[in-house]
Every structure is written in C-alpha cells, then in structure tokens.
Amino acid sequence: MSDNSKTRVVVGMSGGVDSSVTALLLKEQGYDVIGIFMKNWDDTDENGVCTATEDYKDVVAVADQIGIPYYSVNFEKEYWDRVFEYFLAEYRAGRTPNPDVMCNKEIKFKAFLDYAMTLGADYVATGHYARVVRDEDGTVHMLRGVDNGKDQTYFLSQLSQEQLQKTMFPLGHLEKPEVRKLAEEAGLSTAKKKDSTGICFIGEKNFKNFLSNYLPAQPGRMMTVDGRDMGEHAGLMYYTIGQRGGLGIGGQHGGDNAPWFVVGKDLSKNILYVGQGFYHDSLMSTSLEASQVHFTRDMPEEFTLECTAKFRYRQPDSKVTVHVKGDKAEVIFAEPQRAITPGQAVVFYDGEECLGGGLIDNAYRDGQVCQYI
C-alpha cells in the first residue's frame, strides 16, 4: 500500500461545497493537503460587500475543520490579462466567448498550478466533476464525471497532457447529492451553501450593465433576413445566436405566431438579424471551422477523426467527422446543428473520454458561411 502522506496535493478552494469535499477526501486518504484560495476578481457587490472575502471566510472555516494549512493568492492581474481581456476582445469581434474554458486553461491549471509547484506540490486538485485515468506508460486520459448533469469536461477541454499529469479530480466518481451528503456528515460549514452560477466575474449582476462598463454599446437596426425593419437593437454584443428573450419584438408577427430568435449578425453594418421559429433555416448549419484546436494527448499534425462533439455545455453529443490540420479543424456534422455560435467551444469525445477541443470561428450551411459575426 502506498504512503500518501509523502504526496503533497494543493487544492484550489473556492469556498464552495465541491472544493471543500475535495480537500476533505484527500485529507482522509492521507495526502499532505494544502488549501489555496484564488482571488481572481475584485468583486465588490452593490452593497459594498466583497463576495471573495465571504468565500475566503468559508475556506478558512473548512480548512480549520479538516485540519489543513491554507493560503490566499491573488491572481487578479493574470486573470485580467489572460481571461478578461480575451473576453472583451471576443465581444468586440461580435463573438460570444466562454471565459470558463479560458480560466481553466490559463488560471486554474496554469497560474495556480505554477504557484502550487513553488509550494512543493506533486499534484493540484479541484472540485471539478471529471475523472483522470493513468495508463501504465503514464499517459493521462480525461473522462467525463459520472454525474452526467454536472460533468465539466467541456470546460476542461483545453487542458494539456502536462497539466493533466499533475491534476487530481477527487469528485469525478461522485454525484452531486453524494458530495453534499459527505459535507453534511463531516459537519462542513459549506454543506448547504448554494452553488455559484454564471460567469464568475459577473455573478448576480445584470449582464448588460456589467458589459457596458467596459464596452460602449452601439445600438443599430434589427432586421429580418428578408429585409423587414424590426426596430432598434441595444448593441450586437448583448445578443447571441439562437437567443429568444430580450428582443422586445414579441408582439410583432410575420407569417405565423412563432417566437422570434436571433438568427444572425453583421458586425460591419451593425445589423442584428432575427427570424421566427426555433429551427429557422438561418439557425441551422452543417459544419464549422475551429481554431486553437488542442488535444489532451499527442496527436499527428494532420489527421481525420470520427467522434462525437458538444457545441455548448450540457448539450447531448452529436456525431461528427473532424479534419484537423495544425491548430485548426473543419468539423462536419452527421445531422444539421442549431445555433452554432462563434466564440464558443467545440469539444470532442470518444465515448467517455474527452479528447480536447477548439474555439468556433465560423459555421457553414452547405458550404456557405453563416452570417453569425
């Protein structure tokens, strides 16, 4: 039996129940555990309360309860430079970014991992719902978490083999109710704490108000694809492909009473295109182009892959053929897909294994580019 006490694991602790139980399990398994709270954003709310301060109090309470040392480290500059600037640049380009994917790649498994190594860590661990399996030759495979509704491999798809080699996901074999039960049984102060939702630096704030603090809104015309003027939009950055709510045109009808959806954008003319019907023709595509394509283990420079893919979180897998060349890929769908959104992640799977992914640049309908940016 191996002596885990000689293995140091540094746990990223957010003050939530998942990372609390992660630290608890590793401590119970005999590892040398250190808890680290990452302050990535100055998130004082409208009442003057810094939610990070409240979260850190929870980390301190849990660390004291389970008997591990803890530290707080400030990654605000790294987060601003590597995640938030990217987030703003994507919106300026008419795309819809996924900051969680970039945060995992650049902060939790780069800045944090690097910091953990200075503390003598053998591994880092987080409360993500994913699994890592190690081959005899040392190769690490990332598998979906067993809790289908909580699986977070979509957000971890940009991690490298080197990052995964140093990573543990102790919750990957558990379902969320089991995690809460373990926290309650151990009397952890975070056992009943509500899960955080949404983009970490926006939290409960109004998204439009938040974004307008950093990017000037540029109102423009809202049009149907056949040229009918539907009024004014508030700024292209506030809308995403396939969006239904927030258009302000619910009472206007075309040929039928079907609801209206965002079906396209023209950044150069500042036009937002809308159409009626969930499966409007303009929302459907047959392939996409992706860049920043990356796999969790070594792959040839150029190859073709038959696998499944997700184009957004919690979406069922779809069969695809992927033609990879360097860090770019053409992804051809077995069945047409709805609302493929530039800026979002496309993530590839082989059964339970997450193979990697990329960022969507363009969607195509029978070889013609969709007007999504």
Swiss-Prot record:
| Annotated binding of ATP, by residue | G12, M13, S14, G15, G16, V17, D18, S19, M38, G127
Reaction(s) the record says it catalyses:
S-sulfanyl-L-cysteinyl-[protein] + uridine(34) in tRNA + AH2 + ATP = 2-thiouridine(34) in tRNA + L-cysteinyl-[protein] + A + AMP + diphosphate + H(+)
Q: Which residues form the active site?
A: C103 (nucleophile), C200 (cysteine persulfide intermediate)
Give GO MF terms, alphabetically: ATP binding; tRNA binding; tRNA-uridine 2-sulfurtransferase activity
Site annotated as Interaction with tRNA: where? H128, Q344
Listed A to Z, the keywords are: ATP-binding, Cytoplasm, Disulfide bond, Nucleotide-binding, RNA-binding, Transferase, tRNA processing, tRNA-binding
Give the main EC class: transferase
Q: What is its EC number?
A: 2.8.1.13
Tell me where in or outside the cell this protein is found.
Cytoplasm
Instruction: Give the GO biological process terms.
Output: tRNA wobble position uridine thiolation
Query: Mind telling me which Pfam families this protein's record contains?
Result: tRNA_Me_trans, tRNA_Me_trans_C, tRNA_Me_trans_M
The record's disulfide annotation reads C103-C200
The family database entries (HAMAP family) matched by this protein are listed as: tRNA_thiouridyl_MnmA
Enumerate the NCBIfam families for this protein: PRK00143.1, trmU
Instruction: Quote the protein name from its UniProt record.
Output: tRNA-specific 2-thiouridylase MnmA
What organism does the UniProt record list as the source? Streptococcus pneumoniae (strain 70585)
| Highest classification ranks of the organism | Bacteria, Bacillati, Bacillota, Bacilli, Lactobacillales
